[in-house]
Curated annotation (Swiss-Prot):
Known function: Serves two roles in transcription; it acts in concert with viral termination factor/capping enzyme to catalyze release of UUUUUNU-containing nascent RNA from the elongation complex, and it acts by itself as a polymerase elongation factor to facilitate readthrough of intrinsic pause sites.
InterPro entries: P-loop_NTPase (IPR027417), SNF2_N (IPR000330)
Catalytic activity: a ribonucleoside 5'-triphosphate + H2O = a ribonucleoside 5'-diphosphate + phosphate + H(+)
Membership in a protein family: Belongs to the helicase family. NPH I subfamily.
Taxonomic classification: Viruses, Varidnaviria, Bamfordvirae, Nucleocytoviricota, Pokkesviricetes
EC number: 3.6.1.15
Name this protein carries in UniProt: Nucleoside triphosphatase I
Pfam family, any one: SNF2-rel_dom
Gene coding for it: NPH1
Keyword tags: ATP-binding, Hydrolase, Nucleotide-binding, Transcription
Superkingdom: Viruses
Any GO MF annotation of the entry: ATP binding
Enzyme's top EC category: hydrolase
Domain Helicase ATP-binding, residue spans: 42-89
Amino acid sequence: MSSYHAAYIDYELRVTESMTDTMGTDTEITLKPYQHFVASVFLGLDKMHSLLLFHDTGVGKTITTTFIIKQLKNIYTNWSILLLVKKHL
């Protein structure tokens, strides 16, 4: 990782440091530290506008994405968001 990217990730984490790690639904869901890190980095982006998540089955990619989308919906209230996932995860 270049020093530019490392500094940018540090900046993103500072921008989102007050962001909660819980998602209120019927039952409250708390993100694991690595999920919260990914969400913080993505939500702190202002120059890079995409993020590719890949990892093994069962590590929480869908819940991390749902958390990011819920945070974006709070920021951009006029957005319509459509999330497509497989029926069986």
